Amino acid sequence: MTIEIQAQQRADQGSSASRRLRRAGVVPGVVYGAGKAAVAISFDHNTLYYALQKEGFHSSILNLVIDGATEQVFVRDVQMHAFKPQVQHIDFQRVDANTVIEAKVPFKFINGEISPAVKMNGKIIGHLLNAAVVRCLPANLPAAIEVDLSTLVAGESVHLSSIKLPEGVEFASLRSGKDLSVARA
């Protein structure tokens, strides 16, 4: 799934300029990384807000079109208003096809209703993590990681080390020796 989003380069920077943009229905942002200079950009608020609602937007490589030039990026940070459905600021990081990146990818839990813990013991499965940071090349970045709960028994946990990942993808926390629990019955 390739998502394309349109942006315009902006000259005005700072909190006053950003406030003026937000009042005009425009979201300030920045794109940086891959050895290039940071570029201040802006987006139409409604277009960006509805793009953020898509499932794979936060964990996919996106095509960012800035005044006609396309760059491959992924979302590094999104700042939302405290109580309004309003995007305050967004950061994108450029990606190089040959450089390993670290990105947060959500879990998709499957087969929980047929696990022995639920069917035989009447347990409720608790999801301890909703996402994890993975290391991979940009081309290998998954939109979501499936966690199969069909073999989960009462009193047991599913750990990061037991989750099957696509080729070329690894959990960043396992590199540092932290085998976190993902779900427990």
Curated annotation (Swiss-Prot):
Keyword RNA-binding: yes
GO molecular function, one term: structural constituent of ribosome
GO BP terms in the entry: translation
GO cellular component: cytosolic large ribosomal subunit
Entry keyword set: Ribonucleoprotein, Ribosomal protein, RNA-binding, rRNA-binding
Keyword Magnesium: no
Signal peptide residues on this chain, from the entry's feature table: none
Lineage top rank: taxon: Bacteria
Role of this protein: This is one of the proteins that binds to the 5S RNA in the ribosome where it forms part of the central protuberance.
Assembly description: Part of the 50S ribosomal subunit; part of the 5S rRNA/L5/L18/L25 subcomplex. Contacts the 5S rRNA. Binds to the 5S rRNA independently of L5 and L18.
Family the UniProt entry places it in: Belongs to the bacterial ribosomal protein bL25 family. CTC subfamily.
Name of this chain's protein: Large ribosomal subunit protein bL25
Lineage: Bacteria, Pseudomonadati, Pseudomonadota, Betaproteobacteria, Neisseriales
Gene: rplY
